[in-house]
Amino acid sequence: MRSFGRTGGRPLSPRQKTLMAEKLDTYRIAEGDGPLDLCAMFPGKEAFWLEIGFGGAEHMIAQAAQNPDVGIIGCEPFLEGIAKALGGIEETDLNNVRVWPDDARPLIARMPDQCLDRAFVLFPDPWPKRRQHKRRLVQADFLSILHPKMKPGARLRFATDVKSYADEALLTFVSDGRFEWLAASPDDWRCPPQDHVTTRYESKRLGDCKPVWFDFRIR
Ligand SMILES: C[S@@+](CC[C@H](N)C(=O)[O-])C[C@H]1O[C@@H](n2cnc3c(N)ncnc32)[C@H](O)[C@@H]1O
């Protein structure tokens, strides 16, 4: 998928255009086939997190500000989201965020094994119609790409407000066998985790159910 530069929604504002022209090269991860060196990318950081499909970057920027010892890679092909991320990085003066303005999967393939401490898949594109389900990100083949890159004991968070995606994703994670569902009580997946930061998409409440939150520990 060659998706960088996907537009949609509003055109970029003049400030966003300037950010893209002047700052993208500073914070983007370079294209290429070579393996990523996360220690070189984030000097002095010892933990590395990944957010796939950061949308308007609210969650990624807030997590980066709250966790300055962590290096965070965010993936998002949409121009507007990338511009928002660059704005957030600059406004918050962050030194621990890098963006991949494209499909996350080829980037994940370039990561060394067992390098990630956390991953977030928050409100991924719902593809609600049955015939569209095959386009959903969380599928067995995606877990096979992601799992080897996560450290044993690392955490992965998935959230959605689409019931069929919640059911399908939970089944996919649990039946994979390498993702231990951390449901502390029968109901805790109904509440946002304490360290969650509300996203723009989440607050639109476009789905057909209340948001659900699934945290997993990597086996
Ligand atoms: C429904 S939006 C949610 C955005 C954000 N997580 C939020 O909660 O506001 C899903 C986002 O995932 C992005 N996305 C979809 N497939 C992706 C992929 N393979 N790699 C990276 N981002 C992807 C889309 O561009 C979109 O911005």
Curated annotation (Swiss-Prot):
Pfam family, one: Methyltransf_4
Record keyword Ligase present: no
Binding site for S-adenosyl-L-methionine: 51, 76, 103, 125
Function of the molecule: Catalyzes the formation of N(7)-methylguanine at position 46 (m7G46) in tRNA.
Highest taxon of the lineage: Bacteria
InterPro entries in alphabetical order: SAM-dependent_MTases_sf, tRNA_(Gua-N-7)_MeTrfase_Trmb, tRNA_methyltr_TrmB_bact
Protein name from the UniProt record: tRNA (guanine-N(7)-)-methyltransferase
